[in-house]
Structure formats: structure tokens, C-alpha cells
Swiss-Prot record:
GO terms for cellular component: cell envelope Sec protein transport complex; cytosol; plasma membrane. This is Protein translocase subunit SecA. Belongs to the SecA family. Zn(2+) binds at residues 829, 831, 840-841. The lineage of its organism: Bacteria, Bacillati, Bacillota, Bacilli, Lactobacillales. It comes from the Bacteria. Monomer and homodimer. Part of the essential Sec protein translocation apparatus which comprises SecA, SecYEG and auxiliary proteins SecDF. Other proteins may also be involved.
Length: 844
């Protein structure tokens, strides 16, 4: 086994060496153009960009252009920035162009390294995104490096959260766009919620170069980006209003089909609804949100049964009953607003829920780019994850000068108190001799504690944490000055170099002190890497205690045994040993493994949504950008809806099937009383489908004629499809989230939660597609066509507008007609506010 591990390590090392030899040869070829480029005038050098673009358009690949293009950037950087990329920077630039990660130590000039692949890939005209962790770095790098790109004839944009859609679109249309990772993600999601192509801001995702790639693609991998809208009290009141109306209906006012669990309003029911909500036409396209509330109220009152489908517990919560076990299903809620409708029916508080309109994880966001690369000083420890998840290799790049930093062995103390006392003593000693010190902590609380102790010890210092991040760059820039003491959480200040002040080299350079080991070796290495940049002298020292989180979770028992063997029992004993360091790193590897497994599992779940999201977003794009009549698509939806409904009814007897089909058709396709049993008695299933489809087509044609011109027909079709798709997709996202929570418990029953999730999510997706087609069909058949068809910005806005239009009408009517006599204090208030009577009109 040991021999096998040794062989694997030797193989990896040899592969790295072979890769470096290849990169050196390529860098030498770039260097061979140096004299030629130096001889060019500014105008001739700048003209190279147009030449490269023409050659690319004529068939040369970016790989063919690499050597000359990199040489042009080197010479341009020398003239514009006064910087001339070293060979190791050129090597790193080649790795970046190949779609991999060069591991370059702190201070090796990653920002300058990036200019070469960014320039080269921008020549394609398809856009390059330089991704940073915060807007300060985006603005700084775009400003500094933008001088070079602009001089070479490329446009540079900065995408900031505060910018308008127009400004964002201009930024994304530039050759090179600087942005934070989160803003790219949110822009992508928002682009897939718009209803006009001209409202989109992004181009297709081409090439991303991610700075601090480990932070974004590893540490934040599990963080989902979510665009959501809260359901307010007005929305909740609409559930009660719809319930109030539905409870007043008679059996003639609705058409119910028990076998398929579908229900809809009859003509008399529609009349009552229009009168109740003061609407001209319930099935006007503008009122799609209202029909949603009514449909759910109908289902809640006439299909869902107390003690069979659900019950209300002592806390006044509606609990779903599992039809197979008869037990309540903890944490599960009906989707699509049905649960809230049942809450309104039962007179219990309607729970506010924020509706997720769109979401994506960074893992799936960045995997959509045609090419992805990134820079970090500490990526090798996560190489497996980069390779498995993103298909990216990590290539260690040699430093331009040998590393002179001294990394001391860890010091272990029996308690936190003794550890912190030792840290303060070390900091004070170094401060008194003038050596700058950077103290790294894992948490803000630790920063504050050490700050208090340093104040007590009379050591002036700066504290950098989440409370004062706006001064981050300034504090870090001064951290290398003589006598400077800086306390920072481990991740703070990344991307800003710490340069040594006058006389500091002679004092040993910057000393980095870690107050505990992080879960990840990579974070520890990042902290160490703040010292010893570009061959500068420096030191690093980690202080540990048996009471540290990492030690308590993984290492303390073994180390206690080790201490006992060495007879180290005194309270103030300290251990300094290579064996200790190995034990700590072993604990870190286990945590890293656990975290990787967790991120991998998140990806397995999210991959299911990714596939579904891509289908929905692609269909949305087709609708938004369509410059044609969408009648074939809508008619196909109508046909499939009819086929599904007829097939579902034919599961029973033909007599019952025909009754159900007539109810379905009257509620959703044609006028009431236009069909009878005699129409279908002599037909088989296929003939019934054809008959209904022919009748539906006649209704469709009559609806379209009302729109008069082709442009208005297309606009109406897009309004219809986008409204329905967005509403159903939003509900589906919530349903998937609930499913994920539910299947996670099934692992205890020896079932694979991932497999169960994939299977049920697939079924739910098909059900959603069926629901979309059903709703498009129903609205197409029943909508009142009028002259001012116009797409809303989002379906959420349409919903909000509908609610606001109705509420003023309703509140006045309710106050006029409501009686409060005989209402118990704990009963729901008759005003339909959703509150108990004692907290509303019964308040004394």
C-alpha cells in the first residue's frame, strides 16, 4: 500500500515537472518576439489588435495567435504600466488560456499575469469576464489594467450592483468586463425573468477568469444565489377573500370532477366572482393572479378533505396526511398556493412565504461558461475538487525568486487562556523591536478578544474584520510598515499586497501569527502567504490549544495521549513537534474530505434543477426572441392537454369518462351547454380527442381574430405563455425545495435520497409541463381579448398589480357588509384580515 501511494505521488510530481517544462518552452517562444515588438512604434503596436482580430476572423485560432499576442501585451504593459511580465507570469498566463488554474504565490503578480489571457480571449469578440470577490477589487483592477487594454484598443466595462440595466448592458457588451461573482449570477437569473429581449443585459457566457478562484468555486460553492419576492399581507388577505367567495357558491356555480381532482367555475360562478371582485372579465389576461387564488380556494373547499388529506394541529398549523401511512408529514407544505388556501379555509393564520423566482449555485453558474479558468496562491490542496467538478487542472507555477519566509512548527497549549497569553507576549516582543505583525483569526469574536488584550498590554494596532471592511485595503497596505500590528480574520484583505516598509527586511520581514488552524489547510496557507512575497524575508507561526474547535473535533484525544507519554502535565506546557503538525494536518484533511463530499452532494441535487432550469430558460428565450406566430406551439399545447385529460378520464367507465370530459371541456375549452353526452357516445377515445381539438381550434381562431393584426397576436401569445411559465416555474422551485428536505430523511430508511430526489423531481417536472400547457390552453380559450395587451416586466409585478387593483374595492365592501356579532375571541376576524378576532376588530 505504501509503495502504491509513493508511486502515485511520484507520478503526480513527474506530471507537474513535465507540464512546467512544456510551459517554459512556450514562454521562451513568447520571449523570442520581444525584440520585434520593442522595435515597433506605439501606433504599430496598437495596430496589432486589429490585425489579430482580422486573422482570427479569417480562421486562425487563439492558440495560433497566443505567442505574438502575449508578446504584444508584455511590450504594452512595459510602455503603459511600467511593468514587464516575468517568464513565470507568462507561464501562468498560458495555463489560464488553457482553462486551468495556475497556483501562483502571493505577490507573484497574478493581476499582471491575467492581462495576457484576457487580451487574447477578448480578440474573439465574444466577451471576457474577469471575476473578483468584491467591487473594490473589480474597480481597482479595471482601472489599473484598463489603461493597458484601452491603449491596445479593447473596451473595458465594470459591472456594479448599483448600475442600471442599460449601464450593465453596456458593461457586458465591452470586450472585457470586470464584475463580482454574485453580480454575474444575479444578472443571469434576472435575464431569465425578463419578458423582452431588449431587457436582457448579458451576452452568452464565453470565458471567465476568476480571481481567488478557490474562494469562489470552493468556499462559496454551496451558496445559492436566490431571487425571491415576499408574499405580503395583501396577498394573504386575498386567500381569505377567495375563500369567502367560494364558501358562498352553490353546486351550480362550479364544475367538479372528483376522479381527476379538478374543479372550475361554471358561467354562474364566473358571474359571481366578477361581481365580488368588481371585474369586467375574470379570465382577462390581466387577472391571471386572481384566477390562481380562486382555483386554490375551490380545491381547498371542495376537493381537499379534513382528516383525510390534512388536519390542523394544536398550534393551528395545517399538516399534510401521508395517504400511505396515515401519519402527518412534518415540514411538508402543498405547493402552488394550495396550502395557504387550506389555511384560509380552516381560519388559521396564513403563513407568509417568500417565493423563490429563480436560483442557481456558483457551481452550476460557472460551469456554463465555454471556458473557465482562475488564479489562486493556494489551489493544489483542492485539486481533486477542481478536476472532478469543473474539469480544471491546478498547475503550480515556480516563484520568480526563492521563498525566504521561515515557517515555524506549530505551538500547542493546553487551554485557550495560555495560548492567547503566549500570542500577546510574542506580538508585544516583536512590536517592541519594530517588526510588523499580522495576527490572523478565524472569527470576529477572536479578533475582538485579542484586540482587548493588546490594548491592555499597551500595543497599538489596527483591527480588520467584517465591522470595518470598507477600510480593508488601506489597513492591509500599511500592515508591512515598521512597528505595525494588524489583526485580521483569515480571509480579509485578499487581493491586496502587503509591501514591506523601510528597514523592515533587516528586522526579519512581516511575521504572520495564526491564532488557530482553520478547517482547511488552504486557508492556513493563504494566511502564511501574506508574508514573504517576491523573495522578501518573513516568518509564520501558528498557536494552537486543545480547546480549539478543530482540535476538539478531530485531534485532542490523540494529542492528549501524546502529551501523557511525554509527561507533559503542567498547565503551561507547550508542545512543538513535527508529529503535532502532521496530526493537525490529518485532522484538516478529514474536514476537507467531509466538506468536499457535502459540496458534491449539493451539486448532485442542483444538477437535477440545472437540467430543468436550462429547459425552461431555453423555452423562455425561444418565446422572448420569437419573431413569428406562436400558434403552432400553442395549438400543440392544446392538443396535448386534451389528450391527457381524455386519457385520464378513460381510466374509468366510458359513461363516467364522458361526463368528466364534458365538465372539463365546458370549464376550460368551450362555452357551457355546447356539448352533451350524445356528442360523444358513438366515439372512441381518439375520436373524442379529435372532436374536442377541432372545437378548441375554432375557439382559438375566434380569439385571435379579435386581435386584428399580426403584431398584436404575437404580443398576446408571448404574454400568455410567459405569465403561465413564470408562475408555474416559481411554484416548482418551491416544490423541489420541499422535496429535497423530505427525501433527506429517507436515508434512514435505507433509500438513496439522491436517487429518490431525481426520480420524483422528474415526475414533478413533467407534471409542471402538463400544468403549464393546461393553463395556457384554459386562458387562451377563456381570456377576454382587449386592445391594450402589453407585457408586464415580470409575472411577479403582474401579480402585485392585480392584488393592488382589487384590494381597495374589496376593503370597502367588506367593512360595509361584515357583522361582528357572536364572534368568539379566538375565531378568525370576519373582516378577512387573517388575524384572530381578539387581535383585530375584537381588540378592546
Amino acid at each position: 500500500m505504501k509503495c502504491m501511494v509513493t508511486n502515485v505521488l511520484r507520478s503526480l510530481i513527474e506530471n507537474d515537472k513535465g507540464e512546467l517544462r512544456k510551459l517554459e518552452k512556450m514562454a521562451d517562444k513568447v520571449f523570442s518576439y520581444a525584440d520585434e515588438m520593442e522595435a515597433l512604434t506605439d501606433e504599430q503596436l496598437q495596430a496589432k489588435t486589429a490585425e489579430f482580430k482580422e486573422r482570427y476572423n479569417n480562421g486562425e485560432s487563439l492558440d495560433d495567435l497566443l505567442y505574438e499576442a502575449y508578446a504584444v501585451v508584455r511590450e504594452g504593459a512595459r510602455r503603459v504600466l511600467g511593468l514587464y511580465p516575468y517568464k513565470v507570469q507568462v507561464m501562468g498566463g498560458i495555463v489560464l488560456h488553457n482553462g486551468d488554474v495556475p497556483e501562483m504565490r502571493t505577490g507573484e503578480g497574478k493581476t499582471l499575469t491575467a492581462t495576457m489571457p484576457v487580451y487574447l480571449n477578448a480578440l474573439s469578440g465574444q466577451g471576457v469576464h474577469v471575476v473578483t470577490v468584491n467591487e473594490y477589487l473589480s474597480t481597482r483592477d479595471a482601472t489599473e489594467m484598463g489603461e493597458l487594454y484601452s491603449w491596445l484598443g479593447l473596451s473595458v466595462g465594470i459591472n456594479l450592483a448599483a448600475k442600471s440595466p442599460l449601464e450593465k448592458r453596456e458593461a457586458y457588451n465591452c470586450d472585457i468586463t470586470y464584475s463580482t461573482n454574485s453580480e454575474i449570477g444575479f444578472d443571469y437569473l434576472r435575464d431569465n425573468m425578463v419578458v423582452r429581449a431588449e431587457d436582457m443585459v448579458q451576452r452568452p457566457l464565453n470565458y471567465a477568469l476568476v480571481d481567488e478562484v478557490d474562494s469562489i468555486l470552493i468556499d462559496e460553492a454551496r451558496t445559492p444565489l436566490i431571487v425571491s419576492g415576499a408574499q405580503g399581507s395583501e396577498t394573504n388577505q386575498l386567500y381569505f377573500l377567495a375563500d369567502n367567495l367560494v364558501k358562498s357558491l352553490t353546486t351550480e356555480d362550479y364544475i367538479i370532477d372528483i376522479p381527476s381532482k379538478t374543479i372550475g367555475l361554471s358561467d354562474s360562478g364566473i358571474d359571481k366572482a366578477e361581481k365580488f371582485f368588481k371585474l369586467d372579465n375574470l379570465y382577462d389576461i390581466e387577472n391571471v393572479a386572481i384566477t390562481h387564488f380562486l382555483d386554490n380556494a375551490l380545491r381547498a373547499n371542495y376537493i381537499m378533505t379534513y382528516d383525510i388529506d390534512y388536519l390542523v394541529n394544536e398550534d393551528q398549523e395545517v399538516m399534510i396526511i401521508d395517504p400511505f401511512t396515515g401519519r402527518t408529514m412534518e415540514g411538508r407544505r402543498y405547493s402552488d398556493g394550495l396550502h395557504q388556501a387550506i389555511e384560509a379555509k380552516e381560519g388559521v393564520p396564513v403563513q407568509n412565504e417568500s417565493k423563490t423566482s429563480a436560483s442557481i449555485t456558483y457551481q452550476n453558474l460557472f460551469r456554463m461558461y465555454k471556458k473557465l479558468s482562475g488564479m489562486t496562491g493556494t489551489g493544489k490542496t483542492e485539486e481533486e475538487e477542481f478536476r472532478e467538478i469543473y474539469n480544471i487542472r491546478v498547475v503550480p507555477i515556480p516563484t520568480n525568486r526563492p521563498i525566504a519566509r521561515v515557517d515555524h512548527e506549530d505551538l500547542l497549549y493546553p487551554s485557550l487562556e495560555y495560548k492567547f497569553n503566549a500570542v500577546i507576549a510574542d506580538v508585544k516582543r516583536r512590536y517592541e523591536k519594530g517588526q510588523p505583525v499580522l495576527v490572523g483569526t478565524v472569527a470576529v469574536e477572536t479578533s475582538d478578544l485579542i484586540s482587548q488584550k493588546l490594548v491592555a498590554a499597551g500595543v497599538p494596532h489596527e483591527v480588520l474584520n467584517a465591522k470595518n471592511h470598507y477600510r480593508e485595503a488601506q489597513i492591509i497596505m500599511n500592515a508591512g510598515q515598521r512597528g505595525a500590528v494588524t489583526i485580521a480574520t483569515n480571509m480579509a484583505g485578499r487581493g491586496t499586497d502587503i509591501k514591506l516598509g523601510p528597514g523592515v527586511r533587516e528586522l526579519g520581514g512581516l511575521c504572520v501569527i495564526g491564532t488557530e488552524r482553520h478547517e482547511s489547510r488552504r486557508i492556513d496557507n493563504q494566511l502564511r502567504g501574506r508574508s514573504g512575497r517576491q523573495g522578501d524575508p518573513g516568518e509564520s507561526q501558528f498557536y494552537l490549544s486543545l480547546e480549539d474547535d478543530l482540535m476538539k473535533r478531530f485531534g485532542s484525544e490523540r494529542i492528549k495521549v501524546f502529551m501523557e507519554r511525554m509527561n507533559l502535565t503542567e498547565e503551561e506546557s507547550v508542545i512543538k513537534s513535527k508529529m503535532l503538525t502532521r496530526q493537525v494536518e490529518s485532522a484538516q484533511k478529514r474536514v476537507e474530505g467531509n466538506n468536499y463530499d457535502s459540496r458534491k452532494q449539493v451539486l448532485q441535487y442542483d444538477d437535477v434543477m440545472r437540467e430543468q432550469r436550462e429547459i425552461i430558460y431555453r423555452q423562455r428565450q425561444d418565446v422572448i426572441t420569437a419573431d413569428r406566430d406562436l400558434a403552432p406551439e400553442i395549438k400543440a399545447m392544446m392538443k396535448r392537454t386534451i389528450e391527457r385529460q381524455v386519457a385520464g378520464h378513460f381510466l374509468g367507465s366510458k359513461d363516467e369518462a364522458i361526463d368528466g370530459i364534458i365538465k372539463f371541456a365546458h370549464a376550460n375549452l368551450v362555452e357551457d351547454d355546447t356539448l352533451s353526452k350524445a356528442t360523444f357516445e358513438a366515439m372512441n377515445q381518439k375520436e373524442i380527442v379529435e372532436e374536442l381539438y377541432e372545437r378548441a381550434l375554432r375557439v382559438y381562431d375566434s380569439q385571435v381574430k379579435k386581435l386584428r393584426d399580426e403584431e398584436r397576436v404575437r404580443e398576446f401569445q408571448k404574454v400568455l405563455i410567459l405569465r403561465v411559465v413564470d408562475n408555474k416555474w416559481t411554484d416548482h422551485i418551491d416544490a423541489l425545495d420541499q422535496l429535497r428536505n423530505a427525501v433527506s430523511l429517507r436515508g434512514y430508511a435505507q433509500n438513496n435520497p439522491i436517487v429518490e430526489y431525481q426520480s420524483e423531481a422528474f415526475t414533478m417536472f413533467n407534471d409542471m409541463i402538463g400544468a403549464i400547457e393546461f393553463e395556457v390552453t384554459r386562458l387562451m380559450m377563456k381570456a377576454q381579448i382587449h386592445d391594450n395587451i402589453e407585457r408586464e416586466r415580470t409575472s411577479q409585478e403582474a401579480h402585485t398589480t392585480a392584488v393592488k387593483n382589487i384590494m381597495p374595492n374589496q376593503s370597502h365592501a367588506i367593512q360595509e357588509n361584515v357583522s361582528f356579532e357572536g364572534v368568539d375571541r379566538n375565531d378568525p376576524c370576519p373582516c378577512q384580515s387573517g388575524k384572530k378576532f381578539k387581535n383585530c376588530h375584537g381588540r378592546k
